[in-house]
Amino acid sequence: MSPAAVAAPRRRTARPRPRADARLVVQAWFGTRLLMAVVAVWVMVTEHRSLGDVFGNWDVVHYLGIARDGYAEANSIAFFPGWPLLVRLVSLPGLPPLLAGMLLTMVASGAAAAALYRLGGAPAAIAWLLAPTAVFTLVPYTEAVFCAVAFWAWERATARQWGAAAALAAVAASVRVSGVFLVMALAVLALTQAGPAKERVRRLLWLAIPVAVVAAYIGYLYTLTHSWTAWFDAQTSGWARGFATPWESLQHTLSVLEPGAYADHPEWRWVFLAEIISMAVGLLVTLVSLVQRRWGEATWVGVQVVAFGTSYWYMSVNRAVLLWFPL
């Protein structure tokens, strides 16, 4: 028997593997959504809570309020307009805004998992779907839609489709401030990706599109408040996210772990402990990316670690782990 005849069956058996991996990701997406939905229904039935009681808390209140009334509430300008606009658009046919947001996050979580599958294979996509904070990809938070457009922006950039990458990054920049960090990381990728100098300049010029989106929002806030720092001021007054040195930020976070601190919210101790662990994970991912000379990925995670580490305390780092695709 010839070597070609022996090798042929091996090629035929190897072909279905990518399709099987993709099917596994789809099953993981469906399974995790179903599990979270079942848990939510169980809570609603056993504790006599409404859909809004389960899915309409914390930042969701602000997002839905902006979608309904615009920036009418104090400090609501701390939230970028892209997500509320999407919710309002989908709810125009008469769908309740909460359901519109949940529908969007369902679709966006699938799109984000698909991008991760392209970037890192089935293990990366499934790990993202199984992450403890993946619950925020079911409630109407920004994580799902941001990850969808940001991950696909990165995938398109690595495929050298910089026009598409810039358009997706522009959407990301309209959704949350993390879009600024995405643009910074894409700029590093544009400079370090192989090619002549003119090509690198052309890549950078594409990024003027998402930069313009951020500039437009800052300009809009200036027309409302006559302050160029309105967004930072809202973050500081509403969520205690003013600037602090790294050691002050760590000290403020550690103080929450002390016995008796915030006695009316004892669960905060465990949340902030997880925030510290998440910061350590982010630092480790940044260092590993630097060692591997993955400069764009190191920038993407590193600038976020710096931003969180120079805030009053570590807050929302647990959710930000969902954005760190190099992990």
Task: Describe each region flagged by the PLM.
Residues T32-G56, V183-V188, T192, E199-V285, ...:
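Membrane-lumen/periplasm interface segments of specific transmembrane helices
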Residues P81, L85, P93-A111, F136, ...:
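Loop-to-helix entry region of an early transmembrane alpha helix in multi-pass inner-membrane enzymes
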Residues A153-A164, A194:
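Membrane-interface transmembrane helices that cradle and orient dolichyl/undecaprenyl
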Residues L89, A100-G121, V281-V285:
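Transmembrane-helix motifs of polytopic, lipid-linked glycan transferases
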Residues V139-V145, V317:
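Short acidic/glycine- and proline-prone juxtamembrane loop motifs at membrane-interface regions
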Residues M1-M44, R202, W206:
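Start-transfer (signal-anchor) and selected internal transmembrane alpha helices
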Residues L99-A100, L116-A131, A164, W295-T299:
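Transmembrane-helix signature of polytopic, membrane-embedded enzymes
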Residues N57-L95, P246-L254, F308:
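Short hydrophobic/aromatic helix or loop-helix immediately within or flanking a transmembrane segment
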